Amino acid sequence: SSNSIIAPLAASQDSINNPPLYPFIGATFVKIFSSILAPHDAIRLSNFIWISLTLVSIGLMTRELWGTGFGRQAGLIFIASIGLIFNVHTIRPEVSALLGFALALYGFALYHRRPFRASLVLGFGISIIFLSNGILSLLSIFITSLTLLFIKQWRNKRYYLFCLISSIVALSIISPWVYLLYNSNPEIFFSWINKVNAPNGEEFFFYIKNLLWFTWPALPLFIFVLIKNYRNIFQLKKIHLPLFFSISILFTLSLNAKIDQINLMPILLPFSVAAAGGIDLLRRSSASALNWFGILIFGFFGFIIWFFWFAAIT
């Protein structure tokens, strides 16, 4: 494969499918752990870091929206989601993009309390999304920022400044790579830019069909929270922010001609964060059962993953 950090290419490729963040970090892990791990295992170890940072972001945003004590519940719902379990081991840039989406959502959640810090977090999240998945994935962030303007508590000059600073931060991180790619390989640059296929109408129904199993057990709890709070959706940030974010992601996916269930991963974030509030609304016995179910599921899969990993290297 090509050694270029700017445009990492496999031997059979003449254009890039995605920006270089995920392969660059993966290659770094391969180099660091070359003496003890096979390349594909080293890259999967980088997945563990991406997902761990995503979990930290989920905990922070859930605490910001729901208060202390909810972060662990959101994390358990997230890691127990079937879609994550099926895709967490895959060597795909969607894994690193997930951290970007988590940071972006945390940035919006943090806005009212710490607007400047929130703008930095959002800008950094946007950068990770772009440098992992390209520009189309950013559409969901853009749509979310626009839909929030329909809510009175977001419609003020401070919010516009928040969006502006976030954009400046993101551009300052993204622009160097775009500039270097254009200058070093204009053919690859234009090939990548033009690699946008028109949707054919099947995308939306594909994702709706796969939504229930992919987001289980987050989706039922998310719906439960919406039903319980439907009168106050527009007053409660902890409800309307995850809802708008989810709708924006689904709309963006309907425009993505590359149909793949792994593209649903970002929607696990708002579902899990909102669902965390639903656990306290359940009866005490049901909430306790769900809590222990999440702990047991996480423990079981954690044991299985580490068991096979040790078996593979010994």
Residue ranges and their predicted role:
Residues 83-97:
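Short acidic/glycine- and proline-prone juxtamembrane loop motifs at membrane-interface regions
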Residues 1-14, 21, 28:
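Extracytosolic helix-loop segments that constitute the early lumenal/periplasmic catalytic or substrate-binding loops
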Residues 97-113, 125, 270-274:
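Specific aromatic-rich, kink-prone transmembrane helix
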Residues 1, 124-125, 132, 137-261, ...:
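Transmembrane-lumen/periplasm boundary regions of multi-pass, lipid-linked membrane glycan transferases
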Residues 63-69, 104-121, 128-129, 279-282:
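Membrane-interface transmembrane helices that cradle and orient dolichyl/undecaprenyl
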Residues 20-24, 33-53, 87, 91:
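Loop-to-helix entry region of an early transmembrane alpha helix in multi-pass inner-membrane enzymes
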Residues 74-79, 126:
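Short helix- or helix-capping micro-motifs
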Residues 45-65, 103:
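Transmembrane-helix motifs of polytopic, lipid-linked glycan transferases
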